[in-house]
Amino acid sequence: VACMQGMRTGGMAATAKHFPGHGAVVADSHKALPIDRRPLTELTDELLPYRRMIANGLTSVMVAHVLFPEVDEAPAGFSARWIQQELRWGLGFTGAVFSDDLSMGGAAFAGTVPERARRAIEAGCDLLPICNDRPAVLATLTELEGAADPLSQVRLVRLHGRPMPAREQLRKTAQWAECQRAID
């Protein structure tokens, strides 16, 4: 929370990742789909950092390409259960939801990259990174042309960074003085 607040003071928005958690799996979602077999009742500790950051004004979350079969049959980044029910309704999150990179191995089960993008949007994602694959980006843009959700657009506009305070203004704040004392 302190890091997020410091970023906000500096004019930046923070993104919490990888909701609902990536810590109890072995597989690397860049290459394969990790599976976490714990039931939702055992994931409360994983959700606590998100709950705290949301209560303190978190503006965006990136969802994980991790499958939690005891909760939903779709991985979190393609799951309305995780994005709409748990994150938005359960934790009260109103900010932007990023998919993890749709070109990753953990997303491959969902079909072509444009199909992955459509499934992520249907689940509730607002922004869809597609890294290092220009042809897939172009195919996705063509296939999803006109699919913009006005509510997603509003959430994304709210992410625009705040004007960064002048360095001299920052030096006059109590936070600056406190940090300086800690460093010295």
Stretches with model-predicted labels:
Residues 153, 159-184:
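A short C-terminal boundary segment appended to hydrolase-like catalytic domains
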Residues 1-152, 157, 165-167:
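Second-shell residues forming the walls of enzyme active-site clefts
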